[in-house]
Swiss-Prot record:
The keyword Lyase does not apply. The gene is tsaD. Belongs to the KAE1 / TsaD family. Binds 1 Fe(2+) ion per subunit. The lineage of its organism: Bacteria, Pseudomonadati, Pseudomonadota, Gammaproteobacteria, Pseudomonadales. Substrate binds at L134, V135, S136, G137, G138, D167, G180, N276. This is tRNA N6-adenosine threonylcarbamoyltransferase. GO terms for cellular component: cytoplasm. It comes from Pseudomonas putida (strain GB-1). It is found in: Cytoplasm.
Length: 341
């Protein structure tokens, strides 16, 4: 089955072609970072308009790259949520229009299920069951995964997601959008131990997260340095390192608890923050000590992309899941509501 995947949940237009027998044939992405950087964050209306502009040229690009023609496509998968409603509607409308014109099925895919399954595109994919850490700009969740659509939420953030905390903290200390990669870059030059940030909610049982207080702690630390005339580049690096260390250690502690609670020794990390090198190193060290394994997608498939949507949609289509031509998207969509395969 040859599936065209469309991703438009936020500020990246992703298109890919995935074949159930040959694997990923082509993948293309247009990032809107430059468009939104001047505003310090994503402007939903601008995001939607740019998706409209980029979608069809990217579809043509992946068809050319794969050496395919439209009549060879068996189905279309598109992100139906969660995400920005206007942006989601662009992908959904395009998918359903093409599906109607080509007389093929279209299926809406859960954005976070796409992230969750992205490591399945790699050479050594994880086997079920496993624990997944979904960590992005909009989500921080620990999920037990027994199969596609078989999800048990173990814990999640009670306020800011980890990726959101990265972006907001970066903005507070004067860094450009998107803040996560900027903090990671500066953290490499930071002096360890100069600042020590708290590890929120690690001193109590449970698998919930909270990052809003950590963001405030970073702001107060930066403000104190500014008031003392110590707000140079090295201080910015040191604050970035302390913040990143706090987030990484907090996530690692919670992942270890989740693995012990479930008795599992396979951990998948997915979502934009899973590209963070410090987080990967920390989780790899932790799993090595437990004689377990950690899995993640290559960096280009950690952030939003069409490949993960094409793959996730293909699995559901192969299992016989169907959907009518109604255009329906959801800004919020608990992953536990998805039907199991």
């Amino acid at each position: 089955m040859l599936v065209l995947g469309l991703e438009t949940s936020c500020d990246e237009t992703g298109v890919a072609l995935y074949d159930s027998e040959r694997g990923l044939l082509a993948d293309a992405l247009f990032s809107q970072i430059d468009l939104h950087r001047v505003f310090g964050g994503v402007v939903p209306e601008l995001a939607s308009r740019d998706h409209v502009k980029r979608m069809l040229p990217l579809i043509r690009q992946v068809l050319d790259e794969a050496g395919c023609v439209a009549t060879e496509i068996d189905a279309i998968a598109y992100t139906a949520g969660p995400g920005l409603v206007g942006a989601l509607l662009v992908g959904a409308s395009c998918a359903q229009a093409l599906a109607f014109a080509w007389d093929i099925p279209a299926i809406g895919v859960h954005h976070m299920e796409g992230h969750l399954l992205a490591p399945m595109l790699e050479e050594n994919p994880p086997e079920f069951p496993f624990v997944a850490l979904l960590v992005s700009g909009g989500h921080t969740q620990l999920v037990r995964v027994d199969g596609i659509g078989q999800y048990e939420l173990l814990g999640e953030s009670l306020d800011d997601a980890a990726g959101e905390a990265f972006d907001k903290t970066a903005k507070l200390i004067g860094l450009n959008y998107p803040g996560g990669p900027e903090i990671a870059r500066l953290a490499e030059q930071g002096v360890p131990g100069r600042f020590v940030f708290p590890r929120p909610m690690t001193d109590r049982p449970g698998l919930e997260f909270s990052f809003s207080g950590l963001k405030t702690f970073a702001l107060n630390t930066w403000q104190q340095c500014k008031n003392a005339g110590d707000d140079g580049e090295q201080t910015r690096c040191d604050v970035s390192l302390a913040f990143q260390q706090a987030v990484v250690e907090t996530l690692t502690i919670k992942c270890k608890r989740a693995l012990k609670q479930t008795g599992l020794k396979r951990l998948v990390i997915a979502g934009g923050v899973s590209a963070n090198k410090a987080l990967r190193a920390s989780l790899e060290e932790m799993l090595a000590g437990m004689k377990g394994n950690v899995y993640y997608a290559r960096p280009q498939f950690c952030t939003d992309n069409g490949a993960m949507i094409a793959y996730a949609g293909c699995q559901r289509l192969l299992a016989g899941q169907q959907q009518d031509l109604a255009i329906s998207v959801q800004a919020r969509w608990p992953m536990e509501q998805l039907p199991p395969l």
